[in-house]
Amino acid sequence: MTLAAWFAAFLLDSWLGDPPHWPHPVRWIGKLISLVQRAVRRCCHSERALKVGGAGLWIVVVGLTWLVSWGCLWLMNAIHPWVGWLVEVWMIYTLLAGRCLSDTALEVHGVLQQGLLDESRQQLSWIVGRDTSQLDAPQITRAVVETVAENSVDGVIAPLFFLMIGGAPLAMAYKAINTLDSMVGYKTQEYHAIGYVSARMDDLANWLPARLSWLLLSAAAWFIRLDFRQALRIGWRDRYQHTSPNCGWSEATVAGALGIRLGGPSCYFGERVEKPWMGDERRKIALTDIPLSIYLMMIASQLALLLFALLRLLLVGMA
């Protein structure tokens, strides 16, 4: 029934998204991270000690997430297999963020269409780490497309990949890794030491899913009649034109498929960061690139689901 749970969860995410007031494991993981982080900071003060404490933070959060997820599924299956199946569907559903990502991007798109620049800057600031206060409409559009491209990996492709390898508990552990990076994996003075291990482990966890996104997004470009050849070419050529070892794969591929440039200089935490460009500017970026990038992400997500389900079926059967 495991593969059926995958497809049911995927459909649920496509239908419901992430209702803001529903219980969500990522919020619980976030509270655990905050709790353990405070304990680490009370005990560790030097940079070296904070790095060691940060490693402990990572082990505790990821280990507990896997253990609780596995234990919950075991207990629910012991009560009744159908109860276990329903809980598994719920777990997987909470791991997927395709609909949430799509809705958020379309909200910014809608506000931009109305010409409400200040409001679009504010909405964008909720989903990106850069300074949005001075961005114009093309820069906001570029930031949204980059966000959709980047988060197609950690929001859908990577959770499905770890689901294939180790089921819902391992996929939930991946989500803990991703949440740790989001909360403490910064290069700022405050987080550089305590978040060092979390940032490196997130890079490691996303290494293969990011590279698979190059193929999946290129295939998606072919399905929706975008330039899949340029997606493959630019995705490979510009894969390392990013400060992250992983984000360039998906962003460069989307840039190639759409025929636009992504990346470039940005402001983070009050500092200007010079980032290289990805893609060839065969045309200027347009507002329509936001729904196009969402369409790419959705098709790539469906292809990932089918690919990983097939591999799971071939390797271990339906269980």
From Swiss-Prot:
Converts cobyric acid to cobinamide by the addition of aminopropanol on the F carboxylic group. This is Cobalamin biosynthesis protein CobD. Belongs to the CobD/CbiB family. The chain crosses the membrane at residues 56-76, 153-173, 204-224, 290-310. It is a multi-pass membrane protein. GO terms for biological process: cobalamin biosynthetic process. Pathway: Cofactor biosynthesis; adenosylcobalamin biosynthesis. Keywords: Cell membrane, Cobalamin biosynthesis, Membrane, Transmembrane, Transmembrane helix. The gene is cobD.
